[in-house]
């Protein structure tokens, strides 16, 4: 039955086949399964990125890997938009910055747009800006070039909007720049550029 579950992909979005999984404590997790076309253990790399991120002070939901079937691991991450079976309001940075596929087609979005949303509508502004900058530096360090606006998000708390825990942190060798510009014009994997903003 597991192969039937994995085969069609899912409605959870992203490039990898996924499913919601209930843990023994009734918490909801996302399972990211290996793909038939994988030539490396992507789950193991994502788990390594998770461990490095947490040790770098980046806030993330709990993650783990398990070998379920085949040659590669399955990556599990606890859903941060659920608590005691109830939804916590989450919105992507794509939505909260007022962007969509049409607006980003001709104008590459920037981390400065996320920072502007935090400054104008967020709570714990200094802490959230500091966390965002850590994520920029980390993405440069591991060449996470899949850092687009849908891979950043916000959670609505009783006090207001905060950055969600980081997610989908994966090293990549496919591109030579981030998906988001660091300033308004430049997306280079450059620590000095990040220091300048």
Across the structure, where does each feature detected by a protein language model lie?
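Anionic ligand-binding catalytic core segments
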Residues: 1-149, 153-197
């Amino acid at each position: 039955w597991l192969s039937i579950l994995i085969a069609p992909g899912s409605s959870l979005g992203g490039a990898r086949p996924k499913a919601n999984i209930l843990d023994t404590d009734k918490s909801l997790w996302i399972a990211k399964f290996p793909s038939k076309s994988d030539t490396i253990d992507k789950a193991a790399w994502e788990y390594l990125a998770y461990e490095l991120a947490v040790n770098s002070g980046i806030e993330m939901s709990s993650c783990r890997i398990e070998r379920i079937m085949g040659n590669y691991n399955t990556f599990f991450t606890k859903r941060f938009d659920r608590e005691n079976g109830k939804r916590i309001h989450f919105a992507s940075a794509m939505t909260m910055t007022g962007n969509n596929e049409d607006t980003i087609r001709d104008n590459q979005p920037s981390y400065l747009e996320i920072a502007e949303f935090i400054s104008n509508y967020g709570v714990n502004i200094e802490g959230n800006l500091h966390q965002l900058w850590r994520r920029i530096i980390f993405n440069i360090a591991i060449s996470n070039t899949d850092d687009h606006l849908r891979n950043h998000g916000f959670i609505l708390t009783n006090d207001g909007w905060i950055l969600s825990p980081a997610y989908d942190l994966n090293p990549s060798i496919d591109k030579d720049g981030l998906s988001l510009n660091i300033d308004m014009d430049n997306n280079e994997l450059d620590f000095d550029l990040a220091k300048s903003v």
